[in-house]
Amino acid sequence: MASIDRKHLAEITAAVLSFLVSLTTILGIPVALYGYLVTQQQSRVDRAFQFYKDFRDGNLDADVKLLVEKANAKAKEMQALVDKDDQVGILGLQTSLVRDAQVDTALAHVIVFFDAVGPCVAHALCDADATIALLQYQAKQLVKGYGAYVYDQQQSGAPFGNGIFIVNGLEASSRISSLFPWPGRTAN
């Protein structure tokens, strides 16, 4: 009779342990997945912040200031052309700005930088929301002042200048979609 009680107790213990293992597995998988997603999100934010640090630590900040200063000097002329929807005139004015060697060099530096940032965001390797907060203002200023020129310099199939337009066009996402970036984001 004692061997039957031991056998019954062993079966009950095995069933309880099996239940606990199953429960732990069922609860552990979502927790592990959430941890993985949070880590990936933090990695994307860190990459975006590293671009921002590179922007601030290098001469890129000074380059953007120079470019904006030169474009702002022609802001009234630019606005008159925009009001008339004179695309050829806008391109001509922006091209005349880039004829200055300092402006040309600064624009080249900035375009190369944004050509690294844009695809990083477009392919969800960098966080879009962090990029918006840290770098979109500068991209918008540059597209406003030099967008027609950069667009005119692009060649079919070549990625030159795409990054600045990618960063310029970013829209803030909801918090849940930033944890799951793959369904909604596409490369331009």
Predicted features and spans:
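Membrane-proximal alpha-helical anchors
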Residues: A2-I90
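Short, charged, low-complexity loops and linkers
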Residues: V88-V98
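An amphipathic alpha-helical interaction surface
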Residues: S96-N188
